[in-house]
Amino acid sequence: MSKVNVNKVVVAYSGGLDTSVIIPWLKENYDCEVVAFVADVGQGAEELEGIEAKAKASGASECYIADLKEEMVADYIYPTLKTGAYYEGKYLLGTSMARPIIAKAQVEVARKVGADALCHGCTGKGNDQVRFEGAFAALAPDLHVIAPWREWDLVSREQCLDYLAERNIPCSASLTKIYSRDANAWHISTEGGVLENTWNAPNEDCWVWTVDPEQAPNEAEYVTLKVEKGEVVAVDGEAMTPYNALVYLNEKGAKHGVGRIDIVENRLVGMKSRGCYETPGGTIMMEALRAVEQLVLDKSSFEFREELGLKASHLVYDGRWFTPLCKSILAASEELAQDVNGEVVVKLYKGQATVTQKRSDNSLYSEEFATFGEDEVYDQSHAGGFIRLYSLSSRIRALNSQKK
């Protein structure tokens, strides 16, 4: 396939080996100006240290760094959290939720600098290529998209290092990289290495943030979360922004080994992959939010929220954030969350986040109605008529069967 003519391209730059190679490769193969874009989504200060100089040393004419941490948690993570989304019952979508905001910010930089193309460093085997390019299609259909991993003939880290060395481009990456990792404020994922064999238990070096639950403190710790409209607004009596609340709970949860999962998931592109994910703060938030929902939502609303969560998990995972259906589901979840206000105490102990106390001014739970003793507000004789009507279709079906 012939290459398109490109004058200026904005590349999503991480500072790692792949994107360090991509910058000179773009200049050589497309004869274009390359602008580096770096998204700060909470991956850690050490990942960002010296990154602008690194990008320019690789050949970028400019480097834009966008602090997206607060926006990501407030506008992407919290809305998804309100749907109750777990992908395939376990995964809290850490990587998936970060991609749409990175893509959106990358498009904004492209518009600012007058670029006519966008570039990402995702491989041709993973989900992220779909997430980025799906977002680009929704936000900037007029811009060309370049995916070097689907074009070049570099197939190993050794070849990538040689490529940079031949061009005298400095790179601190090592030849042997055991694991592939992705981190943001919500989670860190680890893939590859020993995890590629599902019969291998994860090594301790598969975990980065969290303490081994067996080595966690022998004394439990309790955190109190205040929830308003489905969002954590305060922790342990202190009002916090969404990002600061997450950072605080990450620290508390990691100390007690909370939020570890080892999962084999179905990728969008058809294959299965295995990963170890750590989401300490997110796990605590999800448990607290669900506890308030149990108090506040009626049966039909709770069931509907469960359905929304299942669909939302697939839409977010599959890179369909900027679609009408995803927007509609998020809007419905937002409406359901209007009365999800309350306070929850969560016990952190040996890898578990357990709700021990919960209350809400909007609670539909009534001790008077729920009591098993004698009461004045619930006449048990009324239940018989309800059950007869509730089971009417089953009764008619059985009677019809008896006639045959």
UniProtKB/Swiss-Prot annotation:
Gene3D superfamilies per UniProt: Argininosuccinate synthetase, chain A, domain 2 (3.90.1260.10), HUPs (3.40.50.620), Single helix bin (1.20.5.470)
Binding site for L-aspartate: 123, 127-128
Keyword RNA-binding attached: no
SUPFAM superfamilies registered for this protein in UniProt: Adenine nucleotide alpha hydrolases-like, Argininosuccinate synthetase, C-terminal domain
Major subcellular location class: cytoplasm
Segments traversing the membrane: none
Residues engaged in binding L-citrulline: 91, 96, 127, 131, 180, 189, 265, 277
Catalytic activity: L-citrulline + L-aspartate + ATP = 2-(N(omega)-L-arginino)succinate + AMP + diphosphate + H(+)
GO molecular function: argininosuccinate synthase activity; ATP binding
UniProt KW keywords: Amino-acid biosynthesis, Arginine biosynthesis, ATP-binding, Cytoplasm, Ligase, Nucleotide-binding
Superkingdom in the source lineage: Bacteria
EC number: 6.3.4.5
Pathway noted in the entry: Amino-acid biosynthesis; L-arginine biosynthesis; L-arginine from L-ornithine and carbamoyl phosphate: step 2/3
Cysteines joined through disulfide linkages: none
Subcellular location: Cytoplasm
One Pfam family cited in the UniProt record for this chain: Arginosuc_synth
HAMAP family registered for this protein in UniProt: Arg_succ_synth_type1
Protein name per UniProt: Argininosuccinate synthase
Gene designation per UniProt: argG
